């Protein structure tokens, strides 16, 4: 569970007991008495559907004039966290995270400047344009049956990228001189 005071809490016994996760490095903090508290709030938390130990977390600090993308991944159930913001826009807050239901390395993030995807688990991010204007993407949903990417924006409605499944083959395609994509009947 993520809270508006920047803390992440984890329960391993169906909510009977909760432990605070405090292993994020690189987040802005403030000193309150003897406590070193985060200035950020938790924007989004997403557990992987492929590996129960993998968790993604996005933090936001725009209320303090800081628009940096704070995006992290844990591969050990929250014991340690790796910054995966990599080459996302420097002042593009991250609002939402989605993981492909087939390829665990294909991730999508909604940012202040649109949606970005990665094929390598967050090492490299690519803007996904496809007619989408440069707008804040606040929510992302994946419609698994049709492989549609549904984007909720701030003030511009929602967009649907029909059948994004060719992105799963993109890494292989980029290595080839020529490639064919499987098409959907109908």
Region spans (language model):
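Beta-propeller blade termini and top-face loops
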Residues: 1-186
